[in-house]
């Protein structure tokens, strides 16, 4: 798997992600990784619960009679997005920047640009991600510090994607 790196919008490209934040992300990701397919699907179902019209941004969901929770293409996409997001968060401090496997930030940016993804979509996705993680980890593990760590990691990923949001070359 190729590891693609990108500047995340922080001047100089260096990211500020503390050891404590990294530890919280790694600890929770270690628990969620085993069930990433189901958690990823719950993540996307939560996005569509908050913003039902968001499902129309996905060609494989438009005009589909298959219930969202049973749609095999959504299951595959949801898992890959969730894993990519969590892996990028887990690598953030060590790499010092956003790293993404199996794709490029340029391609992610172009895709999000093409489908008209805007700040409101990223905000809904942040909310859904944090709620999904909160529900996926043991109750006594979730804390304001863990929420903050995941939120910061997500912010860095979004900044890196936004930097590449332009038409595909």
From Swiss-Prot:
| Motif stretch (Homodimerization) | 49-53, 119-131
Which Pfam families is this protein grouped with? Globin (PF00042)
- Alphabetized InterPro entries for the sequence: Globin, Globin-like_sf, Globin/Proto, Leghaemoglobin-like, Leghaemoglobin_Fe_BS
The answer, when asked if Aminoacyl-tRNA synthetase is one of the entry's keywords, is no
GO terms for cellular component = cytoplasm; nucleus
SUPFAM superfamilies, alphabetized:
Globin-like (SSF46458)
The record's remark on the cofactor is: Binds 1 heme group per subunit.
Expression is induced as follows: By flooding and etiolating but not by oxidative, nitrosative or hormonal stresses. Strong, rapid and transient induction by nitrate NO(3)(-), nitrite NO(2)(-) and nitric oxide (NO) donors, such as S-nitroso-N-acetylpenicillamine (SNAP) and sodium nitroprusside (SNP).
Give its E.C. classification number: 1.7.2.-
Q: In which tissues is it expressed?
A: Expressed in leaves, but not in roots. Present in embryonic organs including embryos, coleoptiles and seminal roots.
Where is heme b bound in this sequence? 59, 73, 77, 107, 111-112
Has the keyword Cell membrane been applied to this entry?
no
GO molecular-function terms, A-Z: heme binding; metal ion binding; oxidoreductase activity; oxygen binding
Q: What is its main location?
A: cytoplasm
Q: At what residues does the UniProt record annotate the site feature described as Homodimerization?
A: 147
Q: For this chain's UniProt record, which GO biological process terms are given?
A: cellular response to potassium ion starvation; response to nitrate; response to nitric oxide; response to nitrite
Summarize subunit and interaction data from the UniProt record for this chain.
Homodimer.
Stated family: Belongs to the plant globin family.
Give the protein's biological function. Answer: Phytoglobin that reduces nitrite to nitric oxide under anoxic conditions (e.g. during flooding or in waterlogged soil). May not function as an oxygen storage or transport protein. Has an unusually high affinity for O(2) through an hexacoordinate heme iron because of a very low dissociation constant. Promotes tolerance to low potassium K(+) conditions.
**What is the name of this protein?**
Anaerobic nitrite reductase NSHB2
Annotated organism of origin:
Oryza sativa subsp. japonica (Rice)
Provide the gene name from the record. NSHB2
């Amino acid at each position: 798997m190729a590891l693609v790196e990108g500047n995340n919008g922080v001047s100089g490209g260096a990211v500020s992600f503390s050891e404590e934040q990294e530890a919280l992300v790694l600890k929770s990701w270690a628990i969620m990784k085993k069930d990433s397919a189901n958690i990823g699907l719950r993540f996307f179902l939560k996005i569509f619960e908050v913003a039902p019209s968001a499902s129309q941004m996905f060609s494989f969901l438009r005009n589909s009679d298959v219930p969202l929770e049973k749609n095999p293409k959504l299951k595959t996409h949801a898992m890959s997005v969730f894993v990519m997001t969590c892996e990028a968060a887990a690598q953030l401090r060590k790499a010092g920047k956003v790293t993404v496997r199996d794709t490029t930030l340029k391609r992610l940016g172009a895709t999000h640009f093409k489908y008209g993804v805007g700040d409101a979509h990223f905000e809904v996705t942040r909310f859904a991600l944090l709620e999904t993680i909160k529900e996926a980890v043991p109750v006594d593990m979730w804390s304001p510090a863990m929420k903050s760590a995941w939120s910061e990691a997500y912010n860095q990923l979004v900044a890196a994607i936004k930097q590449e949001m332009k038409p595909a070359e």
